[in-house]
Amino acid sequence: MSEEVIFTEENGIGIITLNRPDRLNALTYPMVQKINKYLNSWEISEHINCVIIEGAGDKSFCAGGDVIKLRKEVLEDGGPPTNLSQSFFYDEYTLNFKISNFKKPFISLINGYTMGGGVGVSMHGSHVVASEKTMFAMPETAIGLFPDVGGGWLLGQLDKGIGAWLSLVGARIKAYDLMKLKLITHYVSSSEIGNLKKMLISSSPSTNDKVDSIINSLSSNPNSEDSVLITNENIIKDAFSFDTIEQIFEKCESLSIIGNEFLNAQFEELKHKSPTSLKISLKQI
């Protein structure tokens, strides 16, 4: 059985490879524990200049926490509340905080699905590199939760309407919109991600400026064809820039008469979410 997460050291670079491509590299509790352990060691090691995190395969960086496996383990552990369920989230959030405060360059190569827990282990780092394959979402309201892993904080830095839309609907956006919203730092074509990794290993940069220089040499502008915001930003802000879920529902209802296909689809999505999750999610934005 292959390791769920692989740790390697090459020329002063600590490399984390999420290695569950058949499960879209979804995080398990042992993976979280191991990443925490290695980051603690690498942060103080004189032999490690920076860290790279990536996902195995060409489809997904990390599609989130493996909630199916977690639920099964929690039930086997005796049902909620359990030490396992509490420990998983505590350690996961500790990991997210550690990445956001990591004292060395932390480079996230999010070349594929980056959702939920995958956002938490990547987008708090100093360098977040997306490609045309990147697909971002915080879909927690669909399972009765709320955007966690620091995702609520990230979305809370955006325009209120945009942050609320992403949080409540769990909307998916790609690289152009991520760059526009400053949720990523760089865009590199997927065909160049391998070269970027080789250049980083060869140079072994120890400062953010040096990392920037290397990434910039391969970076380009993302294609706008997949943008949701170019054509829908204004109506999203009109519908979602409110303080309560009731106000958002009322506004979506009133705007539905104009027959905007995009907004009506977002409203239908909202209707299927947990009301409690929606209220908590909006409160944290």
Model segments located where?
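Conserved CoA-thioester-binding segment of acyl-CoA-metabolizing enzymes
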Residues: M1-E54, F97
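Hydrophobic/aromatic residues within transmembrane alpha-helices
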Residues: I16, I53, D66, V121-S122, ...
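Glycine- (often His-adjacent) and acidic-residue-rich active-site loop
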Residues: G55-D91, A142-G144
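Short, flexible helix-coil linker/hinge segments at the edges of structured domains or between repeats
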Residues: P81-L84, V129-K133, A137-L158, M199
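Glycine-rich phosphate-binding loop at the start of an alpha helix
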Residues: Q86-F89, Y93, G116, R172, ...
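Glycine-rich beta-to-alpha active-site loop
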Residues: I99-I143, L166, G170-A171, A175, ...
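Contiguous mid-protein beta-loop-alpha structural module that forms a pocket-lining wall or clamp
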Residues: G150-K210
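Amphipathic alpha-helical blocks and their helix-capping loop/short-beta junctions
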Residues: L183, S189-K273
